[in-house]
Amino acid sequence: MFKRKSTAELAAQMAKLAGNKGGFSSEDKGEWKLKLDNAGNGQAVIRFLPSKNDEQAPFAILVNHGFKKNGKWYIENCSSTHGDYDSCPVCQYISKNDLYNTDNKEYGLVKRK
């Protein structure tokens, strides 16, 4: 698993870290920093590159349900986020009891109100 290091080696590493006060080198050439004008304002253009895999969405899709009943909130992520559409009890209830799916005429009347 882990190898024990000599205490002298550990002390040398600690001394090296203690010498760098902030723990960050401001002279890091690989880090990009926004250039500011005299007023302290900066501007940058951010480009979103296309995904390497065309089938995968370039963002994460998260489906959740949230509603209040009897003074209590129910907020949970839906299993349809992961493609499991059948095991979500909220989705099952909505599909069985939603007026749009069950009684389209009554849905039209409620929608008008």
Curated annotation (Swiss-Prot):
Residues the record lists as binding Zn(2+): 65, 78, 88, 91
Q: Which branch of life, at top level?
A: Viruses
Q: Which GO terms describe its biological process?
A: DNA recombination; DNA repair; DNA replication; viral DNA genome replication
Name of protein: Single-stranded DNA-binding protein
What is the species of this protein? Escherichia phage SV14 (Bacteriophage SV14)
Question: Any idea what job this protein has?
Answer: Single-stranded DNA-binding protein that participates in viral DNA replication, recombination, and repair. Coats the lagging-strand ssDNA as the replication fork advances. Stimulates the activities of viral DNA polymerase and DnaB-like SF4 replicative helicase, probably via its interaction with the helicase assembly factor. Together with DnaB-like SF4 replicative helicase and the helicase assembly factor, promotes pairing of two homologous DNA molecules containing complementary single-stranded regions and mediates homologous DNA strand exchange. Also promotes the formation of joint molecules.
InterPro entries in the record, alphabetically? Answer: NA-bd_OB-fold (IPR012340), Phage_T4_Gp32_ssDNA-bd (IPR012339), Phage_T4_Gp32_ssDNA-bd_sf (IPR044947)
The record's listing under Gene3D superfamilies reads:
Replication Fork Single-Stranded Dna Binding Protein
